[in-house]
Amino acid sequence: MIKARYFYLYKLIVRCRFFIAKYNTLFKQQVIEFYIQNGKNYSLISKHFQLDSRTLRHWINQFNHSRINGLAVLGKTRNYSLKFKLNVIQTVKNGQFL
């Protein structure tokens, strides 16, 4: 039941385009530079930067394919007030979807 609630919240967020980039391009670039300079161990680097190793692998693949442009954050990130975010969560809890 709890997983279903999170799934609905996720769907609502995706549908409303509430996507907020977790990592900016500069951070991704720093991680890639560290990867290139200090060896190619996904596990150690992902632990050092507290990343999921799949995320690191994805960034490296993007970098290898398109260089720095592949790391760019696509789309416009938005900042929402705490009040708005709580309102969205309350709406999901009450089952009132779009």
Curated annotation (Swiss-Prot):
InterPro entries: Homeodomain-like_sf, InsJ-like_HTH, IS150/IS1296_orfA-like. Disulfide bonds: none annotated. Coiled coil: none annotated. Pfam families: HTH_28. PANTHER family: INSERTION ELEMENT IS150 PROTEIN INSJ. Belongs to the IS150/IS1296 orfA family. This is Uncharacterized protein HI_0112. It comes from Haemophilus influenzae (strain ATCC 51907 / DSM 11121 / KW20 / Rd).
